[in-house]
Each structure stands twice: as structure tokens, then as C-alpha cells.
């Protein structure tokens, strides 16, 4: 029998102390232990992007990370970005551009899109495509998603002017 391990981390700005089994992945920890179900589990191989979260400021696939690897880290989920209002404009653009249908990929897409917009305030469509290429959507055909990210980038630039 494998013994549980202690971890301490910040999740969406709140300190979390937990006992976890060494093989528990971060996605399952977030969903099952913390009830943060916006992080979806799709492929469980790190290729679909549905489980994307931000760890120490970088996006990672939570299905490939063990919960014990987050000890001492800062993790942000889609709930943290949504509740804090950081992506309200991006969420509105996804809605207005019909960039979501079933919604399964949406949290990961929003996490990746916000990551891009933090790196590059004015990405062109090719850069948007490239940055989102690790996130799969089987419903929208991607054009509406790219439109939503581009619309958000333009609006944010306009607000700064």
C-alpha cells in the first residue's frame, strides 16, 4: 500500500494543504479533491488541451502533472481566471462569436488564449492558430475561436489607447 504524501500549494490564490497519493494527477486532484471541475479531462495523454491550467505563470497539462509535483507551486484554474474577472472580455467574445458549442474544450481554450494574450497583446491570426494548436475542438472548426481571440486582442489594445 502506498502512503499518502503531504502537499501545500496555492490554488487560485488560496492556500491548500492536502494529503494525496503519489500517483494522483493534478487534474483529478483539482476535480475530485477541490471540486474545481472546470478543468476537464479528455485524452489523459496531454494532447487535447482540455486539462490546461497555469502553474507558476506557465500553462501546463494537468493530466500529465502529478499533484505532488505542485508542492510549493501556484496553480490557477479556469475558475480562478473567471472569478477574478481576468478573462471576462475573452469569455464574452467566445459567446458573441459562437466560439463554443458543447463547451468541453472551452476552459482549456480560454486558458491557452489568455496565455497568448499575456505574451503578445497583438497576435496575428497565424500566431493565434499556432498557440491554440495544442487544444482540440471537435465542434466549432476553430475559426470562431480564432475570431474571438483576435476580437479580444483588438478590444484590449483599444482600451489601452
Cite the ranges covered by each PLM segment.
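Signature of N-terminal electron-transfer/Fe-S-associated modules in redox systems
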Residues: 1-161
